[in-house]
């Protein structure tokens, strides 16, 4: 069975999408030891599946739920903050000898919220490339509330600007990305 590269889960609000993605992140993340968490559940009976997938892949899990603002600059600042917080969870990457030096420099800027717009737009694919270099495995990308920045922008009058930012950020991460296992 071929796994689709990108899957979009569309369900109503309060349907459990965030919980499901959090569970998937715990299951896949190579930095976790989730055996006890899933012990006794039906999935733990699938030994081959667990051997192949449980804690076997670098996993990026982020949410855009807080990227909101009455003006574009505020929303962009919250997007920078979201990426900075994500970088803080992966600071081990800048200690590695196998990670590109230029990426490390950009990573530091993203982490301190000192990046420019193109660096912010390329942040997810850059993080994925760093993780792939570090682990020598493709990355599983889980994005929650991906539509919030654009929906909030639409209701606050900066739709075009936010669409440009999010389109660049997501298309580079999701389309023709060799560091992507699936999203």
What residue spans do the PLM features occupy?
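P-loop NTPase motor core
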Residues: 1, 9, 26-92
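The conserved Walker
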Residues: 12-13
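Conserved lysine of the Walker
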Residues: 17
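Hydrophobic positions on the alpha1 helix immediately C-terminal to the Walker A/P-loop
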Residues: 20
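Substrate-gripping "pore-loop 1 plus following alpha2 helix"
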Residues: 34, 39, 155-171
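Conserved P-loop NTPase mechanochemical-coupling segment
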Residues: 67-74, 78-121, 149-158
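Substrate-engagement module of ASCE P-loop NTPases
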Residues: 87, 123-134, 161-182
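Conserved P-loop NTPase "ATPase switch" module shared by AAA+ and STAND
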Residues: 135-159
């Amino acid at each position: 069975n071929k796994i689709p590269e990108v899957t979009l889960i569309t369900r109503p609000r309060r349907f459990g999408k965030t919980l499901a993605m959090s569970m998937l992140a715990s299951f896949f993340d190579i930095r976790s030891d989730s055996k006890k968490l899933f012990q006794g559940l039906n999935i733990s009976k699938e030994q081959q599946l667990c051997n192949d997938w449980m804690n076997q892949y670098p996993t990026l899990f982020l949410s855009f739920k807080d990227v909101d603002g009455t003006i574009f600059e505020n929303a962009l600042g919250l997007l920078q903050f979201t990426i900075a917080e994500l970088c803080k969870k992966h600071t081990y990457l800048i200690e590695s000898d196998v990670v590109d030096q230029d990426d490390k420099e950009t990573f530091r800027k993203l982490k301190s919220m000192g990046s420019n717009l193109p660096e912010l737009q390329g942040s997810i694919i850059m993080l994925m490339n760093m993780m792939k270099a570090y682990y020598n495995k493709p990355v599983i990308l889980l994005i929650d509330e991906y539509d919030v920045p654009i929906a909030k922008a639409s209701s606050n009058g900066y739709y075009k600007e936010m669409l440009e930012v999010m389109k660049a950020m997501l298309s580079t991460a999701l389309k023709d990305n060799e560091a992507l296992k699936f999203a």
